[in-house]
């Protein structure tokens, strides 16, 4: 049997409600890793299991500090010859961000699988136990090597880059506009596609070369009608290095906002990345805005929250918008 480490970080999968009928009202991050493993003894038939409690938080409360700490712990684990795979139990709210970040900064061919649940461990028909079993099955599979970081939810295997939480009340909560990598049936993975984007061993970013417990400041401004420039100005004043504009449609920005945002870019060096609030599709460069003229960046198909992480990592390497644009094409 392969050796799999379960790294617990909290979330709904470690949550507890007042009664078994509380599936949506509960306290997250209450159940420790040993209890999670004990609740699914069948995982011991799949692999030799070790548990580590890295964090105990609801995932919306994760900051750069926790994200970097987790990446370093996971990196240390996969470097050990005795470890064949890692499962990370995680809150679903920001699971896609953590998965994508690890996909960019941890250099390994070993399976790293993030898993969570939509119902707390105390709920009737809790989804966490089967999800955890399936995640261990995936992480212990030799077929799961070189796939990049994955998210396993509801027996679907997703690429960290593509996956997003698309539904907040059902167990089939995670989706990818490009489809799942595969599916799991009774502990066996069946594969249908792979990602052509750079990840893990092919990434130019490396957690071992990132110092400190904070990334360059990048924030998101959500687009709508009747917008004001105040949020952009406030973030610039606070020292933020880049803003992800979660624009309407094709990453659009209202014409009455453009002069002020361009001023912040030109005079204060505030980088602007155009993403979209639309769940599917991608942002075309020089379509709604003349990005070449403005020196702005198009996020391609990355949603705003993933664009924020890639931009933060990009700023650890360069301030050149053309170089950063290439990163958005390649990752």
UniProtKB/Swiss-Prot annotation:
Positions contributing to substrate binding: 59, 92-93
Catalytic activities: L-glutamine + H2O = L-glutamate + NH4(+); L-asparagine + H2O = L-aspartate + NH4(+)
Domain Asparaginase/glutaminase: 2-331
Single Gene Ontology BP annotation: asparagine metabolic process
Gene Ontology cellular-component annotations: periplasmic space
A Pfam match: Asparaginase_C
GO molecular function: asparaginase activity; glutamin-(asparagin-)ase activity; glutaminase activity
Compartment(s): Periplasm
Highest taxon of the lineage: Bacteria
EC assignment: 3.5.1.38
Record's keyword terms, sorted: Hydrolase, Periplasm
Active site: 12 (acyl-ester intermediate)
SMART domains assigned to the protein according to its UniProt record, in alphabetical order: Asparaginase
InterPro entries membership: AsnASE_II, Asp/glu_Ase-like_sf, Asparaginase/glutaminase-like, Asparaginase/glutaminase_AS1, Asparaginase/glutaminase_AS2, Asparaginase_C, L-asparaginase_C, L-asparaginase_N
SUPFAM superfamilies (alphabetical): Glutaminase/Asparaginase (SSF53774)
EC main group: hydrolase
Assembly mode: Homotetramer.
Similarity section: Belongs to the asparaginase 1 family.
Name of the protein in its database record: Glutaminase-asparaginase
Phylogenetic placement of the source organism: Bacteria, Pseudomonadati, Pseudomonadota, Gammaproteobacteria, Moraxellales
């Amino acid at each position: 049997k392969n050796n799999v480490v379960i790294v617990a970080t909290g979330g709904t999968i470690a949550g507890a409600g007042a009664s078994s009928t509380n599936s949506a009202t509960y306290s997250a991050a209450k159940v420790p890793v040993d209890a999670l493993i004990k609740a699914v003894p069948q995982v011991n038939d799949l692999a030799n299991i070790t548990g580590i409690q890295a964090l105990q938080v609801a995932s919306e409360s994760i900051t750069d500090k926790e994200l970097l700490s987790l990446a370093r712990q996971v990196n240390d684990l996969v470097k050990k010859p005795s470890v064949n795979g890692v499962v990370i139990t995680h809150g679903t709210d920001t699971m896609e961000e953590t998965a994508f970040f690890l996909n960019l900064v941890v250099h390994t061919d070993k399976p790293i699988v993030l898993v969570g649940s939509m119902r707390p461990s105390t709920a009737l028909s809790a989804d966490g136990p089967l999800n955890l079993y399936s995640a261990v099955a995936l992480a212990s599979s030799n077929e799961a090597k070189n796939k990049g970081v994955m998210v396993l939810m509801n027996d679907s295997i997703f690429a960290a880059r593509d996956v997003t939480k698309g539904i907040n009340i059902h167990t089939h909560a995670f989706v990818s506009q490009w489809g799942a990598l595969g599916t799991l049936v009774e502990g066996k993975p069946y594969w249908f596609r792979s990602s052509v984007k750079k990840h893990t061993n092919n990434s130019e970013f490396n957690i071992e070369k990132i110092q400190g417990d904070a990334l360059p400041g990048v924030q998101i401004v959500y687009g709508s009608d009747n917008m004001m420039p105040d949020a952009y100005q406030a973030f610039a004043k606070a020292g933020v290095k880049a803003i992800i504009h979660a624009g309407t449609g094709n990453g659009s920005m209202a014409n009455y906002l453009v002069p002020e945002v361009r001023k912040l870019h030109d005079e204060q060096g505030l980088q602007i990345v155009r993403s979209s609030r639309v769940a599917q599709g991608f942002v075309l460069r020089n379509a709604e805005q003349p990005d070449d003229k403005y020196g702005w960046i198009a996020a391609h198909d990355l949603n705003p929250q993933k664009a924020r992480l890639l931009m933060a990592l990009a700023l650890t390497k360069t301030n050149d918008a053309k170089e950063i644009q290439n990163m958005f094409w390649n990752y």
